[in-house]
């Protein structure tokens, strides 16, 4: 519970900062950061968001603006008090908002930002994590926030950090509606009271904010007045100064008197110059919205500044697309690709505010899901429509045909932008590292643009070395006899490159695409073909490699020769495999496990088993179909065939078949249901190899716990006793 202190009738409540926020503030206060100026950008950005909210509410309920029609941001430096004040006429905060938003409830980004900071990230990232307000403590020793929401009284929040803050009802000067942030600056931060410095920071970070930012400065100026006016003014001053004598008529000291002797002749009154104090108001962001200007007149620096003010990013954007659409529908858009993926790119619960929607230059909202598909959620920018109604609601947006057309155009322009970027290999590499998952998600979700998206994919292949290659480049290198694009999915480039599945394909000189991200499994389910060539997994049944007559004949002979062994192995393994066949894909491995054409690969099975909310019924039928393929040219398989032909009931044959199957499961990327039994078989093989007699070991250690004997195969489909092999 907060402490309550009573000052007369005024009630002051003290709250402790939530632990992570207190830690963050301590980090901000006690670490040296060179670019402290970003505090002003963050506070202006928060003010702009508050103004956006009240303007949006007023579109459906104009009475919300009765408490103040003008939407603006004022900056007021006061050198004598050493304070810098920011005032906005935004939505304001209720008492509950004040307590929750400024201290007691940690945002999801608080911890992530601290981790990023400690890993060496720049303090200027703070706004991207939703905790920009606390940057005020970079320059302030104490912060006071006075706020008034239409639904509540005026309240004041105050904190000098130190782990706690106070909230009280504020009976000072009424602010109507909005928020006033008063920063009591540290002694060494008074530069932010200087006109030049404030202007410089606002121009650098906030010149594209959509509301007027006005700087209020107390200045002195010389004023020229006539003698009569001077006397009146002096007279007024005299009344105010009680301690001065009132005998003589006041004389104004000459600052720069107009010494004209013949003034009488010219019938002109004498004039004097005096100094007076006045408040100078200067609007700092008169720039009209950048997206309304002609792209040819805008420099890359201006785009960069706008991008930074829009996103709170400290780095420049990677690429930009500025376009307008005219005709039946009219809108302008300015889209940016960032250099990095945000920390919460695929967090579903977080409302994305990456594209701001305007209607005729009036901001409507910044979390419009209908404006851009999920897979392009990293694109930042603005869209300004001439056709949508100003008072459009979220419900109307969902049904809006205009918005559907805008969305279609945005997707088209984004894909154009990616294709343009692909021509610059260095920058495309950065883009692909950050956003390849988005492109693959697009292939899974967006059937209309699947072909265009597939052209943007880049993969390592068996022939690409350290570089990544496009599917178009792969097709251009295909052999004349090759009809399909071969690929393999797995956990890493090293794992798939050494896989048994690629042995013969590579030996025959065919290129294999290595797909090593979990999302590739989903992507390739939808991407059935590219440029007229089907995509074929080398880990699934039915792999057809171009063969000449001699190879076909040899394959038929092998099938006939090993037919009985295949039948026997199927009997021994029973339900563990759907069938046992001769392989055309193995070279140096004795066997491998392949899956049916429509079943999951081993990699997909691994991914699905890792899902916390998996559907076990789907797991059942998708992972059941396994085929064991044996290599007819391998000595192990040949020896096994000979043993089986000599005595198909030989226990050693059964043991070896099970051991081969389980080893093939592992090398093919599957997991074992009973790894302990498999391990015990391997240990027994090692003992045999070392010539250790098991009976002797047991006799030497009579007190040792004897492990349960591994049951024979007949009684259990998972295990069999290992017989000594010649």
Curated annotation (Swiss-Prot):
Its main location: cytoplasm. Molecular chaperone that promotes the maturation, structural maintenance and proper regulation of specific target proteins involved for instance in cell cycle control and signal transduction. Undergoes a functional cycle linked to its ATPase activity. This cycle probably induces conformational changes in the client proteins, thereby causing their activation. Interacts dynamically with various co-chaperones that modulate its substrate recognition, ATPase cycle and chaperone function. GO terms for biological process: negative regulation of proteasomal ubiquitin-dependent protein catabolic process; positive regulation of transforming growth factor beta receptor signaling pathway; regulation of cell cycle. The modification Phosphothreonine is found at residues 299, 481. Signal peptide: none annotated. In the resting state, through the dimerization of its C-terminal domain, HSP90 forms a homodimer which is defined as the open conformation. Upon ATP-binding, the N-terminal domain undergoes significant conformational changes and comes in contact to form an active closed conformation. After HSP90 finishes its chaperoning tasks of assisting the proper folding, stabilization and activation of client proteins under the active state, ATP molecule is hydrolyzed to ADP which then dissociates from HSP90 and directs the protein back to the resting state. The record marks 126-127 as: Cleaved under oxidative stress. Ubiquitinated in the presence of STUB1-UBE2D1 complex (in vitro). GO terms for cellular component: aryl hydrocarbon receptor complex; cytoplasm; dynein axonemal particle; extracellular region; melanosome; nucleus; plasma membrane. The modification N6-succinyllysine is found at residues 219, 533, 579. Residues 225-246 have a biased composition (Acidic residues). Belongs to the heat shock protein 90 family. The modification N6-methylated lysine is found at residues 533, 576. It comes from Oryctolagus cuniculus (Rabbit). This is Heat shock protein HSP 90-beta. The TPR repeat-binding motif mediates interaction with TPR repeat-containing proteins. Residues 215-554 are annotated as: Interaction with AHSA1. Monomer. Homodimer. Forms a complex with CDK6 and CDC37. Interacts with UNC45A; binding to UNC45A involves 2 UNC45A monomers per HSP90AB1 dimer. Interacts with CHORDC1. Interacts with DNAJC7. Interacts with FKBP4. May interact with NWD1. Interacts with SGTA. Interacts with HSF1 in an ATP-dependent manner. Interacts with MET; the interaction suppresses MET kinase activity. Interacts with ERBB2 in an ATP-dependent manner; the interaction suppresses ERBB2 kinase activity. Interacts with HIF1A, KEAP1 and RHOBTB2. Interacts with STUB1 and SMAD3. Interacts with XPO1 and AHSA1. Interacts with BIRC2. The gene is HSP90AB1. PROSITE patterns: HSP90. Keywords: Acetylation, ATP-binding, Cell membrane, Chaperone, Cytoplasm, Glycoprotein, Membrane, Methylation, Nucleotide-binding, Nucleus, Phosphoprotein, S-nitrosylation, Secreted, Stress response, Ubl conjugation. CDD domains: HATPase_Hsp90-like. Glycans are attached at residues 436, 454. The modification S-nitrosocysteine is found at residue 592. Residues 221-272, 697-726 are annotated as: Disordered. The keyword Secreted applies. ATP binds at residues 46, 88, 107, 133, 394. The modification N6-malonyllysine is found at residue 401.
